[in-house]
Amino acid sequence: MIRFYGEVELVIVLMDGSDNYHISDRHCRISKETAMHFAASNATKIHGVFAARFRTSEDVMDAVLDYLESHKEFILKILKRVNGTDSDSVVFNIPLSGAGFVVSADGRVFIANRIKVVLKEDENYRIGDKARGLFVASAYPVR
């Protein structure tokens, strides 16, 4: 079990295909409603939306997976609006931990040990592949 300490924010980072996206604290204050508005009005420019706050504990992994499951439709809706397809990936960043959760659009959940990680969309998910310029350091399925 991976343990996190202190307050951790989950951030959804939506990839728009440019080289301008990155993960930063400025993305941590956007509400779900604001994210929907951004997706509608700036579909190709959205970089990140605030997703949730967790008071961390030893079972934070279960809380994260429950969150992903319960918000799956919202996540896919935003991805489809931003990218025009359901085939992209979204990064769940946990800034204070140095770990991230990666969810492919088909619902597969991965945990990664670097913050800026996107898995290449192929059947192998090979470690060391480059995806949109971000190096995939390591990742493995958790569901």
Task: Show the residue positions of the predicted features.
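Low-complexity, glycine/serine/proline-rich disordered segments
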Residues: M1-T34
